[in-house]
């Protein structure tokens, strides 16, 4: 974690530590989303979180993915996978952590769900999809690899395919009470598990214009919308026609 304001350099060692963190965190993973344990910031904050989550889910629902072939990157325990399946999509979910895939498998199974264990920093899609969804992953992609990540989005889509990205805004209330966010120009932080173990992870907050520009470099025209406090959402199309959340 940088204390000087200079950007952190992220190498393979940091990425390996990040993966180890998510593998070890599986039993605590949902606490962040449900605002329990160390993530409970009080009734008012939880109510705002839930309202803003409902807004984001509404933006995803508006894409009308029924019958679509959807790629989900880094699904974790499946908190958003269930919505995609409920919408009638066929979902291929790719995650590097086998423990997360086991948790997802325990949450939901069915003929429209395929699970793939793979490193998303090296994985390449076997085919093109109608849509790519990545919920709370892009902030864990370092600057050194963000261009390649956007190219992965592009390579995964049919012409006219849709991208849906959601991630956290930089707010202290979003993370655990015992976590410290990186400097504004930094991209790594230390995360702590309930048992006291600590890990370095990437946490890179990107501005709206920066995100739109990175998508454009990969041939995706995107627009960005924010909720009041917690979430940044980008929606775009590969063929250059922007799709706004509604």
Task: State where each predicted segment sits.
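C-terminal alpha-helical "lid/dimerization" subdomain adjacent to the S-adenosyl-L-methionine
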Residues: 166-214
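Class I SAM-dependent methyltransferase SAM/SAH-binding core
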Residues: 69-122
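Conserved Class I S-adenosyl-L-methionine
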Residues: 201-238
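Short catalytic micro-motifs in class I SAM-dependent methyltransferases
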Residues: 136-140
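A short glycine-rich, Lys/Arg-flanked "PGG" loop and its adjoining helix->strand segment in the class I
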Residues: 147-159
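A conserved beta-strand element that flanks and buttresses the S-adenosyl-L-methionine
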Residues: 133
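Conserved class I S-adenosyl-L-methionine
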Residues: 2-64
């Amino acid at each position: 974690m940088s204390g000087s304001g200079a950007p952190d350099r992220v190498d393979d060692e940091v990425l390996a530590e990040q993966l180890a963190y998510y593998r070890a965190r599986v039993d605590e993973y949902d606490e962040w989303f449900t605002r329990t344990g160390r993530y409970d910031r009080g009734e008012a904050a939880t109510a705002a979180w839930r309202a803003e989550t409902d807004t984001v889910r509404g933006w995803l629902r508006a894409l009308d993915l029924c019958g679509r072939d959807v790629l989900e990157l880094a699904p974790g325990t499946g908190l958003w996978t269930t919505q995609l399946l409920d919408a009638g999509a066929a979902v291929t979910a790719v995650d590097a952590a086998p423990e997360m895939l086991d948790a997802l498998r325990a949450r939901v199974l069915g003929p429209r769900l395929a699970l793939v264990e793979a490193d998303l920093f090296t994985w390449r899609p076997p085919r093109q999809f109608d849509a790519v969804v990545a919920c709370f992953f892009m902030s864990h992609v370092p600057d050194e690899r963000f261009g390649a990540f956007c190219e992965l989005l592009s390579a995964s889509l049919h012409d006219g395919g849709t991208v849906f990205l959601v991630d956290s805004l930089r707010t202290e209330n979003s993370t655990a009470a015992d976590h410290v966010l990186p400097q504004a120009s930094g991209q790594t932080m230390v995360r702590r598990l309930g048992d006291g173990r600590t890990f370095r992870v990437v946490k890179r907050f990107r501005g709206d214009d920066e995100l739109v520009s990175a998508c454009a470099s990969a041939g995706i025209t995107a627009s960005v919308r924010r909720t009041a406090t917690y979430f940044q959402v980008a929606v775009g199309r590969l063929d250059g026609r922007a799709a706004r959340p509604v």
